[in-house]
Amino acid sequence: MEKTLSIIKPDAVKKGVIGKILDRFESNGLRIAAMKKVQLSKEQAENFYAVHKERPFFKDLVEFMISGPVVVSVLEGEGAVLKNRDLMGATNPKEAKAGTIRADFAESIDANAVHGSDSLENAKIEIEFFFKPNEIC
């Protein structure tokens, strides 16, 4: 069964919409195989988003991701990566389709409520970043 990583970002955690977002996953056929709430350190955020290190938004992204706790989940299901990305909506909430997580809960392109793996390969890497094998069930 395909797995993907989801992060509910600090803006959505602060708004108290964790349950609403998790319900979107479950009601659309994604099973929560692992989940934890964590406060990322600066080093963890920099390592997780290292692929963006040379991008102009990197510093702001890291600062945002350490501004409060996040909820990290492993989602499992048929076509989990694509299904999660469809549920999230466009990166910029202004461009996200009505009914998507970002259209409903995100504030801006920076505070955009959720992160989701963009490929099966990255999902594997991202899941291993946050979870040990025995934490996924």
Curated annotation (Swiss-Prot):
Annotated localization: Cytoplasm
Q: Which residues form the active site?
A: H115
Q: Which reaction(s) does its UniProt entry say it catalyses?
A: a 2'-deoxyribonucleoside 5'-diphosphate + ATP = a 2'-deoxyribonucleoside 5'-triphosphate + ADP; a ribonucleoside 5'-diphosphate + ATP = a ribonucleoside 5'-triphosphate + ADP
**What cofactor does this chain's UniProt record say it requires?**
Mg(2+)
Name of the protein in question:
Nucleoside diphosphate kinase
Task: Write down the Pfam families for this protein, in alphabetical order.
Answer: NDK (PF00334)
Q: Which UniProt keywords apply?
A: ATP-binding, Cytoplasm, Kinase, Magnesium, Metal-binding, Nucleotide metabolism, Nucleotide-binding, Phosphoprotein, Transferase
| Key word Isomerase present | no
The record's note on quaternary structure and interaction partners says:
Homotetramer.
Q: What is its EC number?
A: 2.7.4.6
GO BP: CTP biosynthetic process; GTP biosynthetic process; UTP biosynthetic process
> Origin organism of this chain?
Campylobacter jejuni subsp. jejuni serotype O:23/36 (strain 81-176)
A single Gene Ontology CC annotation of this entry is: cytoplasm
Protein's UniProt keywords contain rRNA-binding: no
Under SMART domains, the record lists: NDK (SM00562)
Instruction: State the gene name recorded for this protein.
Output: ndk
